[in-house]
């Protein structure tokens, strides 16, 4: 919505047919269209880069294009582990790093399963976007009682000081216990704040505990506590 306000036009569901000179030719709703541009940025996704590993040659099993691994990163050959993009799980640098920790722990006779439900995701735009856990739609598919709270950044003191009031925070909870199911942040410093939620989820903290964690003032992340208030109590101090 903010990008639309800034003049960005979206053509969702379009099928790109070709690119020639400075024109992109595409199909949308059965109509052939084109758009001229000074620059074209293509984002076509990623695939596991397993070329040159000779993994199949030594008998390692694949799951489609990726190397198949268990919860401790072992392949079907017990003394061979696969971490990072080659296993096709969650293709993020911090995921690969933690997968490495899990694999080394298992090699050293410790055990810690990889939990892909609690991996933060970050988008480095302005304002930033970060998220962890379930979306509201997914939470309502999996749980009978879901509470959702939102908090606008225009009600946050530090954001007002910095002049970065675009954005909001959203917290999704299990309605009976206050279990944290998901958190989504669209705000300045969003990628720095999501780590707090990662710690909270891995420590199985509840909404009540997050509300009573004292955040310093003025900071952007004190808005996080208010978003938990909004979700769990139905109201936040600075957005009444």
Region spans (language model):
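Flexible, glycine-rich terminal cap/loop adjacent to redox cofactors
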Residues: 108, 125-135, 140-240
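Rossmann-like dinucleotide-binding cores of NAD(P)H-dependent redox enzymes
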Residues: 1-31, 89-97, 105-138
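Short gly/ser/thr-rich secondary-structure transition/capping motifs
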Residues: 21-27, 60-68, 154
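Short, acidic, Ser/Thr-enriched surface-loop or helix-capping motifs
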Residues: 5, 70-71, 174-175
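FAD-site-proximal beta/loop scaffold in flavoenzymes
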Residues: 10, 34-106
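A short alpha-helix-loop-beta-strand transition element characteristic
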Residues: 61-63, 110-118, 145-149
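Short acidic/polar mixed-charge low-complexity motifs
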Residues: 29-33, 177-179
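A short, glycine/Asx- and small/polar-enriched loop/turn
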Residues: 20-22, 77, 162-167
């Amino acid at each position: 919505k903010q990008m639309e306000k800034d003049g960005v036009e979206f053509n969702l569901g379009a099928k790109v047919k070709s690119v020639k000179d400075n024109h992109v030719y595409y199909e949308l709703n059965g109509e052939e269209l084109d758009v001229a541009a000074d620059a074209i940025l293509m984002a076509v996704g990623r695939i596991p880069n397993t070329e040159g590993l000779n993994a199949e040659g030594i008998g390692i099993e694949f799951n489609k294009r990726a190397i198949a691994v268990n919860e401790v990163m072992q392949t079907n050959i017990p003394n061979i582990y696969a971490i990072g993009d080659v296993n096709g799980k969650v293709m993020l640098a911090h995921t690969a790093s933690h997968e490495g920790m899990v694999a080394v722990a298992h090699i050293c006779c410790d055990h810690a399963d990889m939990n892909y439900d609690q991996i933060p995701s970050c988008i480095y735009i302005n304002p930033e976007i970060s998220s962890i856990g379930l979306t509201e739609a997914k939470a309502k598919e999996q749980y009978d009682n879901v509470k959702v709270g939102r908090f606008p950044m225009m009600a946050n003191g530090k954001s007002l000081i910095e002049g970065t009031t675009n954005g909001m925070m959203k917290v999704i909870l299990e309605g009976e216990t206050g279990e944290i199911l998901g958190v989504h942040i669209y705000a300045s410093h969003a990628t720095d704040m999501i780590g707090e939620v990662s710690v909270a989820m891995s420590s199985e903290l509840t909404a009540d505990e997050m509300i009573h964690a004292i955040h310093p003032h003025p900071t952007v992340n004190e808005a996080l506590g208010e978003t938990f208030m909004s979700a769990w109590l139905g109201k936040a101090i600075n957005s009444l």
